[in-house]
């Protein structure tokens, strides 16, 4: 009887095992797929709507910067360069025929209401509105945005919202990037553990996290705003003003805060930038003016308390 049962059972099991992937298996989430760049026509439509060229980044991301060169913001006696803390940006990630868009708009208080209303009317969500710095003059707010849909329409919506600000929107001629700043960038890079780049008179470093970040099952690459950002603006004699934000999960928040404060680095904000991301992320903003290498060591100690790529 067992032999007869086996003859019936094993063919049935074989059919079930073969059919399961075909009938019951869910499609792989986008987080496991390598995202491709936008087709040239789509990229052109995005760039035309925003009025400038984008910068391609890994993960099918096209990123745009809108430096607030119109603002003269001073903190602790330092005039903040746009590349240090005053750069609006938006990033477009290809999701099939659509795009996921994330960004951060640098706004004066007087600009917030009009920009928010414009974005809402055109289908772009706000996921956070807050400070990044403390004690700067004039006071600056940061509005984080998110949308999924037709990339050209989203680009037009963002451009329309920016027209309610004094943000310079005309595409400026490409200027050669500064080859160096008055800092020992090689020593800073060795200390932090990653190489940076010079942009707008500021030495910028980015440190990605080790785990995947997901929104609606889509993997969010570091260029979409989920990497720790560290910026050094030279102030003379080997010193620098630093600011940026650590991207953290909950259990990392207080250990990182401890390391920063022990290094004389002020924590200026702790908050979220997104909604419904996995894992839940917290962003810790910081500020200090001191010897650049001393600050780099403090930042490295804080990074060591995180699951960041080394």
Language model segments and positions:
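Bacterial N-terminal signal peptides that target proteins for export
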Residues: 1-12
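Extended intrinsically disordered, low-complexity coil regions enriched in Ser, Thr, Gly, Ala
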Residues: 81-83, 109-135, 222-225, 250-275
């Amino acid at each position: 009887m067992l032999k007869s049962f086996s003859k019936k059972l094993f063919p049935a099991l074989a059919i079930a095992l073969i059919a399961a992937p075909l009938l019951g298996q869910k499609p792989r989430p986008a987080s496991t797929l390598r995202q491709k760049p936008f087709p040239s026509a789509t990229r052109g439509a995005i760039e035309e709507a925003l009025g400038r060229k984008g910068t391609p980044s890994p993960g099918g991301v096209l990123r745009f910067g809108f430096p607030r060169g119109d603002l003269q913001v001073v903190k602790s006696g330092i005039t903040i360069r746009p590349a240090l803390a005053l750069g609006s940006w938006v990033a477009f990630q290809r999701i099939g025929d659509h795009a996921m868009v994330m960004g951060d708009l640098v706004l004066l208080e007087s600009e917030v209401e009009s920009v928010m209303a414009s974005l809402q009317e055109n289908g772009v969500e706000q996921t956070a509105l807050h400070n990044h710095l403390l004690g700067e003059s004039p006071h600056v707010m940061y509005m984080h945005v998110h949308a999924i849909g037709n990339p050209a329409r989203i680009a037009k919506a963002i451009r329309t919202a920016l027209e309610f600000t004094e943000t310079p929107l005309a595409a400026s001629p490409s200027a050669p990037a500064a080859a160096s700043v008055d800092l020992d960038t090689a020593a800073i890079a060795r200390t932090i553990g990653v190489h940076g780049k010079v942009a707008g008179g500021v030495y910028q470093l980015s440190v990605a996290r080790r785990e995947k970040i997901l929104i609606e099952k889509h993997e969010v690459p570091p260029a979409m705003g989920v990497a720790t950002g560290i910026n050094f603006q030279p102030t003379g004699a080997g010193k620098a003003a630093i600011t940026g934000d650590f991207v953290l999960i909950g259990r990392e928040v207080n250990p990182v805060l401890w390391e920063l404060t022990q290094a004389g680095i002020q924590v200026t904000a702790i908050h979220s930038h997104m909604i419904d991301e996995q894992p839940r992320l917290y962003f810790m903003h910081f500020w200090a003016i001191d010897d650049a290498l001393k600050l780099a060591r403090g930042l490295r100690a804080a990074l060591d308390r995180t699951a960041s790529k080394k």
